[in-house]
Curated annotation (Swiss-Prot):
Belongs to the SepF family. One of its GO terms (biological process) is division septum assembly. This is Cell division protein SepF 1. Disulfide bonds: none annotated. The lineage of its organism: Bacteria, Bacillati, Actinomycetota, Actinomycetes, Kitasatosporales.
Amino acid sequence: MGSVRKASAWLGLVDDNNDDERYYDDDYSEGPESGDAWVTDPRVKVASDVAEEKGRRIATVTPDSFRDARAIGELFRDGVPVIVNLTAMEGTDAKRVVDFAAGLIFGLRGSIERVSTRVFLLSPADTQVISGESAAHRSDGFFNQS
């Protein structure tokens, strides 16, 4: 009952009907509810299961032009390692995509590795890449290509 209604009832301007009587406690039972157990839709997954599956995905992108760099950025931002194959691109656009990828890995604290000529692997910060080559053959990294 609102405060104005209570004041009106106290002054005798309206009937003092107790509106709370329309709710009955008998309609509600205490304790567990009888019936079938709630079943989760099999398409719904627990967040931790989805997070584990994200670690199992690797994307391969073969851009035709610099406009395709957005797809690389969106995948990498979502935590998916991306293999970028620049063999189908012209040299100037390929350099722009590599510069874009370098900005991505710097901004999101990832890493970039050269897999082969004009093919690069962008790895998010939480991804571990195991190389099969020995330490003697390994170069000083992506940024030392002089």
